[in-house]
């Protein structure tokens, strides 16, 4: 897949009809999901990933990336703990399932405490909600 850099939308974890419409309204064809709410406590299965991809395709959008898996998928790997080999195999399965489903990019963080940020969106100028740094 040889695609030029484009603007896409993301940073949501549920794929709703409203979000798919919003992506189109914003003039984008691409989107990513951040730690999507998919079933699985060790890995993501092909069928679930393919379902998300099919919804994107039906909306004439490209699901280009999933950013972050649950930390419990790879915390033992990050910390070098017993069970890391099993987690590594599940991560390999997740990546393969993503590829099979046609989702080309997996972004991840390498922080066992999760991503650091302010815990809740704050009310900003004009009533907008967003991250506030104090």
What is each model feature region?
Residues 1-134:
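N-terminal pre-domain/capping segments
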């Amino acid at each position: 897949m040889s695609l030029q850099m484009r603007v896409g939308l993301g940073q949501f974890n549920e794929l709703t009809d409203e979000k798919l419409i919003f992506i189109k309204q914003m003039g984008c064809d691409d989107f990513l999901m951040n730690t999507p709410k998919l079933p699985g406590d060790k890995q993501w299965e092909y069928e679930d990933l393919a379902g998300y991809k099919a919804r994107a395709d039906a909306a004439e959008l490209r699901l280009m990336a999933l950013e972050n898996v649950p930390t419990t998928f790879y915390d033992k790997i990050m910390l070098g703990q017993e069970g890391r080999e099993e987690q590594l195999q599940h991560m390999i399965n997740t990546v393969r399932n993503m590829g099979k489903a046609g989702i080309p990019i997996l972004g991840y963080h390498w922080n066992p405490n999760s991503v650091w940020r302010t815990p809740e969106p704050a009310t900003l100028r004009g009533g907008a909600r967003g991250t506030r740094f104090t």
